[in-house]
Amino acid sequence: MQKFSLERALSLESKYDDSLQTRPIGDWLSKFVLWFSVLFALYHYVTAGIGVPVDFWHMGAHMSGVIVLIFISFPAFKKLKAGGEAVDVMGRLSGVPFYDWLFIVVGVMASLYVGVTWYGLDLNFLGFSFSIPEQVLRMGVPLPIDVVFGTLLIIVLLEAVRRTIGIIVPIIILLFTGYAVLGPYIPIQILKHPGLSWSLFVNNMYFPDLGIYGVTLWIVSTVVFHFVLFGVLAQRIGLGQFFVDLATVADADEGQATGTRLLGLAEHIPSGLDAHI
């Protein structure tokens, strides 16, 4: 049986797993991604031990980190995944187009907006004042700025999902979104319903405990992430192969002991029976 080495595993992954076909980036950005990933992982493991921050900050930080890594690593189109060295050309920074940097900035701002404005926000700048009431007063009646940031986050997440796992899931999401918002205009009577306004839809999708910042993201950021990361690290350092080898050795020892016991038993079989055997 062919030994399942790390090199063979990486080769199979790069061949069949489309989500691992990332784009080439520059040296300084590669170092940034490395250290950002290390700090991102340490944040999750440290907070798992000493206690996570309040949900709207923790999930916002988790979402921000994921958005940064996705839009740096995954190009918009598959044809951009071809190998080659990353160069700084017009419209690109260390191999990453400026529209992807825009996605990162918008996604991080929209992810952290809920935490920043949770207890309200009062801004005074150059004689202009801007006030946002605390989040509990905006539930069900979101402000226009809430709708803007919520819409931006939905767009960014749809694009992130498309880049990482394909177009099918975003299409399904858009179909159900259209069904929720365009209910009164559906021609099939049995499917028609009053529908939701876009602001109410964004309210349900954007604010915690309801949509994007609901139970699923909380479980992923507090439990699932840690197990997935441990599995990846175990594979990369050869821990998986260690357990395979350990099982093989244990099976070999057990097989040898079984063979010895069978030979010992055969010595005590009567000669007549032995002849028949």
Each model region followed by its residue ranges:
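Conserved, well-structured core domains of diverse proteins
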Residues: M1-V141, V147-T151
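Hydrophobic alpha-helical transmembrane segments
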Residues: V148-L152, P170, S221
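Generic alpha-helix detector with strongest preference for long hydrophobic helices that associate
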Residues: L10-E13, D17-R23, M90-L93, I132, ...
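Membrane-embedded alpha-helical segments and adjacent helix-loop junctions characteristic
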Residues: I154, L182-H276
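Structural signal for alpha-helical transmembrane segments and their membrane-water exit/capping regions
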Residues: A41-I50, I70-K81, G107-L126, V141-D146, ...
